[in-house]
Amino acid sequence: MNKIKSLFAWLWQKFRAFCTWYKGLYQGRAWYTKTLVALASCIVAFILYLGAVDINFLWLFGKSPGYFSGILDPQTSEASEIYSADGKLIGKYFNENRTPVEYDEVTPDFFKALVDTEDERFYKHIGIDPIGVFAAAKDALLHHNGRGASTITQQLAKNMFRVRSQYSTGLLGKIPVLRLLIIKSKEWIIAVKLETVFSKKEIITMYANTVDFGSNSYGIKTAAKTYFNTTPKELTTGQAAVLVGMLKATTYYNPRTNPENSFARRNTVLYNMVTHGDLSKDRYNELKDEPIKLDFKVEENYDGQAKYFREAVANYLKDWCKDEGYDLYTSGLKIYTTIDTRMQKYAEDAARKQMKQVQQNFNNHWSIRRTQAGKGNWMGQDPWQDENHNVIPNFIQGIAERQPFYKALIARFPNNPDSVNYYYKEWVHPVKVFDYDKGSITMNMTSEDSIKYMTTFMHCAFVAMEPQTGAVKAWVGDIDFDHWKYDKVTAERQPGSTFKLFVYTEAMNQGLTPCDKRRDEYISMEVYDKKKHEMTTWRPSNANGSFSGDSIPLKSAFAKSINSVAVRLGQEMGIKRIIETAKKMGINSPLDDTPSLALGSSDVNLLEMACAYSTIANNGKHHDPVLVTKIVDHDGKVVYEGPTDSEQVIPYKSAFLMQQLLQGGMKEPGGTSQSLWGYVGNYRDTEFGGKTGTTNNHSDAWFMCVSPKLVVGAWVGGEYRCLHFRTGALGQGSRTTLPVCGYFLQSVFGDPAFQQYHGKFDKPQDSDITRDMYICASYAPKPKVDTTKVDSTAFQEEIVLDDEGNPIIREVPAKKAESESANGTATTEEKKEKKKAKPTEQPVNFDDL
């Protein structure tokens, strides 16, 4: 403190000495000399003042941007753009929605209108317009009608460097009058600096890119898109005039909220163009009466395609941005991703189509009448039930108590539960809910009914991946992003029998082959129950509740998803070894070292499973999922490139044999994936394999499908695990989930643009692999005596395959066909068409766990 006092005392002493010297200059001088000295002194004082402001002398004026720290490299908040693999802009990340453009990307009429209206001497001044300043001062003094004197360059300085906020925080800036003087001084200084560094063309382009047009539209590119759904280059003269007119007051002259004001202001701008020779009088007369036609839509962060995928990309880049010093929402990055918009649309359409049917089945199954929601007893049964099919008490109440609105009711009525109960259970009010046909709809119902309505929707996830590159080509996180933002692709759920992939892969690693046999018989063992904290006897059963007692080839056991064989293999190979194999292939979720892991008891997510199945399709080479291929900064420099390396994590022989097992799901008699033929049976140039999965009580239904160049996976289930179907006929993976993949594959492989995904798995490349390892007789259960006419556990609609493993369509004798036709029954061709139309209705009699 003493040092500061001494400094000010020294400065005061020097100032007094200067005043004494300065006073001596006037003594004995002529009047004109005194006048010249006074003028020179004012000029010098003003220059010294500007210098003091620029260097923030004694912290009195606040910081200013230097040439190297700001002027040469101006930083503005720019939206980061995200692009698909097929070159489409699919969304943005932004705080201020701004995307810069080049001078040549804007119609010349916009710049003409801008200069004619905002700064007519723009091309003549050096950042400050003395004529404009004196004219504004004269109007203020004589007419008490002040007008703006800021040049375009000064406005750019204000927009780009925020001189009215962060650069006016000096000590003197706290004094209102001095604050205004300092702000204008800084604008002048920065404007002159900008004029010395940039050309007029660069300055006016930077201004067009930084100015605020209202409605969260920053810059000419975003404004043109928001108000007219066009590009800056395609703006008409009238549209350009509307946007320029808004700059005086974005709210008052907004064409959407104040159309009359905007209309008058537009014509003023057009007249200014006539005055300066940039628009003919005849053209003005044509334009002045034209109405303003808007195509208005405010762009939000969540607008665009692949919304769940874009959120996944944001999470993926969070750490990278932090490490590299970028802000995803302000740095103006261009992010190039692996997603394909055409495949994404196929995936979203497939999910919506199948889930609409699943939801209809679920509603009928539980007697839920959604159209009557909020009107009496619209739910016939409560579907939230435990593993013993008992209704879970207070289930909906528990969900409600976690919601903000319920917490607000408790805070408002802390000692009045009747009021809370009224507003929760009795007060009917408009609520926005989801509808498959209309998207978001408004219904009148109570808060309790709205929770029931939204909770009883079934959900899904889907992902498609290239096994050779890890590139994610399609990503569906749920049925509707606006209502459910939680991404089910990365949600962890029990995989059921789809986890058997790792059990059998480890078996192949340890020398077994698809033609080796294991007995399907009763098995029990002592295991530790984590819920009860005690040892208990675990008796895994097959889906049909019985055991054949036969020795079954592994290819048949895998295709039919026989649990007893999988559990036996798990014990034989070792659960720890199976966990190691799963981790190598792409599973990062924690896995429990317990015998039930062989049946998929530990939670994993769909992306991990797709990655692991891709390892098999890629001949044992693992590639991490790739979402982003490269990132380019706002200067055009590539600052990130996605990974391209893969690693051989399982032997080629094991991968090849697993490819045969997966294909067996479709080719083996009784294979649980056979209904996929109803979707891909026409594509004989491509081989497919699949694995279904369904957990206890049908809470989770899965399907994983592999082909040589494309792997897809899907999950279907309730938001809560207690919401599910009660029967395998409706709830198993082959019924609920397989069609999602089927519809997608049908669209992709039927599209000539994706011919590159067609193909067959490679022939064996290892001399150690012989045909007798994977080609052998399939298991056929022995006929049972004293049973029903059709034994659902033994009977499976037979699909006959040719030498290439493709289904053979049997011919119906002509006489028989004619007879059926005459009797009014469907012919073979009609049946085939019907089967194609509803492939989900093919009978599947194995309830795959």
Predicted regions: what is each one?
Residues 145, 280-338, 342-418:
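Non-catalytic structural connector segments
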Residues 1-83, 121, 141, 358:
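N-terminal type II signal-anchor transmembrane helix
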Residues 99-104, 451-460, 483-502, 515-518, ...:
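Short active-site loop at a secondary-structure junction
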Residues 337, 341-357, 391-466, 475-476, ...:
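A penicillin-recognizing enzyme superfamily signal
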